[in-house]
């Protein structure tokens, strides 16, 4: 080979090597410019709008729960299971439902529409609440008193069609949702016999009322603030706010005469509601009552009403369910405890339960280490550790208070009459919880979820949540998926809301002044950090609304990263964990869906959840050799951490 040829050959080799290096750098740059996108883009690209990894798991869980319902229907052994079968048969008997029509509802609608003044209407509205469990004048929930631990009555904003606050009613992104509900109400009224013009006028009248009420109610962010919605007053104080309703008569008629102390969640909304409870607005109240009766019960009557309901679901959820599918969904809603018990027996193995228990305890131990080396002063650290060590762990909880199981379906009654009677039983039984410490599970086990309950200081890992585990022996993959989820929920014990409650789940200011000031500093930094992310171009993430969930995300990632460190994990282990974390939150949402989510969800959008957390994680930088040239890079002084 000549000297010139040798030089040319060497040059080609150099060019080739440089090209390989450049290609590697390019690929590596994509890898860390948007970690969420890099990990998930191949999965997402062929998915339909609205798809998510979690939805796929929930569909699998739902199918499993449906199969359990089928097994119960085919071979019921207990009285509760026989009720499930009776409900199913009645729901599918569309011939009898069509024949019965609205006979069981027309009586109530007629009585409401015959009232001639607001006092007569109030009398009928109270009867309506007693008979149909429809709350027109006051919405009530039974929850724990944050200071005593006993169940009390919370007076909450009255239910509206699509939200409680102006955040929903004034936002243009929700126009399609609002129009769908208006069309739904319009069709219900037309089917009942109103003319097109009458139905249009009534729909607009009700929408105008809700819009004004929402504009005079707490903002969405306020409804998430303990100080805003925990407002203990007595009945006499409520009487001074809601002057057009005889409060004593109202509570006495409902069998709640012993109630004195209660929590008024949104005083402003009831001040506004009071202005409407006059003779001048009698027609409005009649129309609200009519539409509420139809919304609540008409789907259990004729095929035409059922079709109106299923078409609304198709517009809102993107799927039109068959009658049989709807029956299974209703069974899961009405009998959550029965389905949960059977679901747990079939899908929660002892091995999985033990694995989750051990992992949860490992996470709790790591939180203790993090707390003991944190910015808290010694007094606050001691109380934080006490709270941590008193967290109750519930796996496959299945302790829903299933009041509906106490009602025996009567085959001689119509489906809608049975549902009316069942709702009365449920309402009466729920009132019996007042002034007790009875606890109920918020979610059935056939749900992909875990949650921290601040009033019982418990971490609740639903059986459906374990579906994310593919192999209990794959420690690092599980650490990034179910491990992160558990660590996230435990972190809620110390977020902006959870930190206000002690180890017994009672409202208590256990932070010293200096620790509280430092924590507020950290919260402000987290808010600013997440405000800097955009959901879509020119639409910023709301760091204030998402503060609690962002704190939980950051704390969870610190926790599982520390576990990796203590397990002497290698680079591949870190990559496995971080990739697993990113995959769980994969979704394919449209721009409008992302904006809508930001209005109603306290979590940051999933892409921000992944990239925001990892961009503040030092070990992530080391694992992927991220530097200032990469878009995932955040200057060290601008990164946020909760405990370190």
Predicted segment positions?
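Short secondary-structure subsegments characteristic of cysteine-rich extracellular domains
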Residues: 48-71, 196-214, 478-485, 573, ...
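Noncatalytic, helix-rich "gating/capping" subdomain that lines the substrate-entry/channel surface
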Residues: 64, 68-363
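Active-site-proximal beta-strand/loop segments in catalytic clefts of secreted hydrolases
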Residues: 38-39, 156-158, 462-464
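N-terminal Sec-pathway targeting helices
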Residues: 2-16
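Primarily extracytoplasmic ectodomains and periplasmic/lumenal surface modules that are beta-strand-rich
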Residues: 36, 42-46
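Intrinsically disordered, low-complexity linker/terminal regions across diverse proteins
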Residues: 206, 341-644
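Membrane-interface motif at the C-terminal end of an N-terminal transmembrane signal
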Residues: 21-34
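Short, solvent-exposed loop/turn and secondary-structure capping segments
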Residues: 45-50, 57, 164-166, 217, ...
């Amino acid at each position: 080979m000549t000297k010139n040829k040798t030089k040319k050959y060497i040059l080609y080799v150099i060019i080739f090597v440089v090209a390989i290096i450049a290609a590697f750098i390019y690929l590596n740059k994509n890898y860390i410019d948007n970690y969420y996108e890099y990990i998930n883009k191949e999965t997402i690209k062929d998915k339909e709008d609205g798809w998510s990894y979690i939805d796929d798991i929930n569909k699998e869980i739902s199918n499993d729960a449906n199969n359990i319902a089928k097994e119960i229907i085919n071979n019921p052994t207990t009285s509760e299971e026989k009720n499930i079968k009776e409900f199913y048969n009645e729901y599918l008997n569309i011939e009898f439902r069509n024949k019965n029509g609205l006979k069981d509802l027309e009586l109530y609608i007629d009585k409401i529409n015959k009232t001639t003044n607001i006092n007569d209407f109030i009398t009928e509205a109270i009867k309506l609440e007693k008979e149909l469990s429809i709350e027109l004048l006051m919405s009530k929930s039974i929850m724990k008193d944050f200071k005593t631990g006993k169940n009390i009555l919370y007076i909450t904003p009255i239910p509206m069609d699509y939200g409680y606050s102006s955040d929903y009613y004034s936002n243009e992104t929700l126009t399609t949702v609002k129009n769908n509900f208006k069309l739904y109400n319009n069709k219900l009224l037309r089917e009942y016999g109103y003319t097109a013009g009458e139905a249009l006028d009534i729909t607009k009248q009700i929408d105008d009322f809700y819009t004004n009420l929402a504009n005079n109610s707490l903002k969405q962010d306020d409804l998430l603030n303990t100080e805003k919605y925990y407002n203990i007053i007595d009945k006499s104080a409520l009487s001074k706010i809601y002057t057009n309703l005889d409060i004593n008569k109202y509570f006495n008629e409902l069998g709640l005469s012993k109630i004195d102390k209660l929590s008024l969640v949104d005083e402003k909304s009831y001040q506004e509601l009071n202005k409407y409870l006059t003779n001048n607005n009698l027609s409005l109240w009649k129309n609200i009552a009519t539409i509420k009766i139809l919304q609540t019960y008409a789907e259990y009557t004729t095929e035409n009403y059922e079709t109106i309901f299923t078409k609304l679901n198709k517009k809102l959820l993107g799927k039109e369910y068959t009658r049989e599918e709807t029956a299974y969904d209703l069974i899961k809603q009405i009998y959550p405890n029965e389905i949960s018990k059977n679901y747990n027996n079939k899908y929660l193995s002892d091995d999985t339960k033990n694995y989750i228990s051990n992992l949860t305890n490992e996470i709790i131990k790591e939180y203790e280490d993090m707390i003991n080396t944190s910015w808290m002063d010694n007094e606050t650290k001691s109380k934080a550790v006490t709270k941590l060590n008193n967290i109750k762990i519930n796996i496959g909880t299945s302790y829903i208070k299933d009041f509906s199981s106490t009602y025996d379906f009567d085959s001689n009654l119509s489906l809608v009459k049975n549902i009316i009677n069942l709702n009365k039983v449920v309402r009466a039984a729920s009132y019996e919880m007042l002034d007790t410490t009875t606890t109920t599970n918020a979610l059935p086990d056939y749900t992909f979820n875990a949650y921290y309950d601040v009033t019982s200081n418990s971490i609740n890992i639903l059986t459906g949540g374990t579906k994310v585990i593919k192999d209990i022996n794959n420690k690092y993959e599980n650490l990034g998926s179910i491990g992160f989820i558990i660590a996230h929920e435990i972190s809620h014990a110390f977020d902006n809301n959870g930190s206000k409650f002690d180890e017994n789940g009672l409202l208590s200011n256990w932070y010293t002044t200096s620790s509280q000031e430092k924590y507020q500093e950290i919260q402000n930094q987290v808010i600013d950090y997440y405000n800097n992310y955009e959901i879509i171009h020119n639409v910023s993430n709301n760091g204030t609304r998402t503060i609690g969930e962002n704190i939980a995300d950051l704390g969870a990632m610190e926790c599982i990263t520390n576990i990796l460190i203590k397990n002497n994990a290698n680079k591949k282990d870190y990559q496995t964990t971080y990739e697993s974390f990113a995959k769980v939150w994969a979704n394919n949402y449209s721009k409008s869906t992302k904006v809508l989510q930001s209005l109603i969800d306290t979590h940051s959008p999933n892409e921000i959840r992944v990239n925001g957390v990892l961009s503040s994680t030092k070990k992530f930088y080391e694992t992927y050799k991220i530097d200032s040239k990469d878009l995932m890079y955040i200057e060290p002084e601008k990164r946020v951490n909760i405990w370190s």
